[in-house]
């Protein structure tokens, strides 16, 4: 079929398999250009490995460190009439390129919150790898089905206490608007912590530990975002922030447990990037368009891949083997460049000046839209979008 982008809200409902493959190839090339990572882990599990920071982690481990990787994700394959999800095509491309390099790559597709996902992963590790040296926890799901009851819990992107009103951009109309979001109820806050907090990370680590598949010195990392005062009301000070604080709680508990065998657990605070997850958060697209422009001008812009490469090589797996720098909460801070005072001051001063008319001049909004479409495989250099492509792409993946 000839596949063109179809946007609905903040989701593109079509995806391009060739474009997605090109994206993955580009990220692999970037990783290889950095050279091999010293002291890199050799057997890595990535929970939530099909897009964004999770995919970058898998690529970095495999192509930067030569690791055998297992990826867990929840994606949809294509049918003859409907394209698969971008994460499906990303994972297929990763698997193809890993195998071409002679790297071990296995993937499990299904609900990572389920007990079955944990058990199947453990069985696979025992069968193929014996143990693992690193666990990356990178789930960004809006819902969680509770294994014991089958109840489906939903998270909320809402402030706490007061209605939040701010300048935002309507990405469908390319217009500056005023966005208002009602505050979360106490139940919605608790539900958001249940879905996006640290409990499932702990359950994964406990299951892996109890099964004896964590090697001595195993490191685990989960990803977070704190942001700045421009986004705090909807993010860090909102329901989502409470969930991210729960990740910090989980990291402390896990770090104590893993330290007995020389391992570590950290939350890594990353910079804002264009992902399906961030595009759903009010004010984030406008903030990202603003901060990206300034960071590019300052020569400190990073995408997902650059961020994770820096986390591996300059934080967790340093050449001299030294412990990474952390903040007072034991977090790895990769948002350090974004939070530079000159960059944030620029954004604070620019925010009230942006209008629909000057949006494209004052910010990198055009690039934001291009990067958003790229997530789904569109607008990628070197891809002919008028060519008939087969949406059905198979690879080495087992259903959970």
From Swiss-Prot:
Q: Which InterPro entries match?
A: Eno_Rdtase_FAD-bd_dom, Enoyl-CoA_Rdtase_cat_dom, FabV-like_NADH_b, Trans-2-enoyl-CoA_reductase
Residues that hold NAD(+) according to the record: 48-53, 74-75, 111-112, 139-140, 244, 273-275
Q: In which pathway does it act?
A: Lipid metabolism; fatty acid biosynthesis
In the UniProt entry, which residues are flagged as the active site?
235 (proton donor)
Its EC number(s): 1.3.1.9
Q: Name one GO molecular function term.
A: enoyl-[acyl-carrier-protein] reductase (NADH) activity
Q: Which domain of life is it from?
A: Bacteria
Which regions form coiled coils?
none
Spell out the residues of the site Plays an important role in discriminating NADH against NADPH: 75
Task: Describe the protein's quaternary organization and the partners it interacts with.
Answer: Monomer.
Name by which UniProt lists this protein: Enoyl-[acyl-carrier-protein] reductase [NADH]
Organism the protein comes from: Aliivibrio salmonicida (strain LFI1238) (Vibrio salmonicida (strain LFI1238))
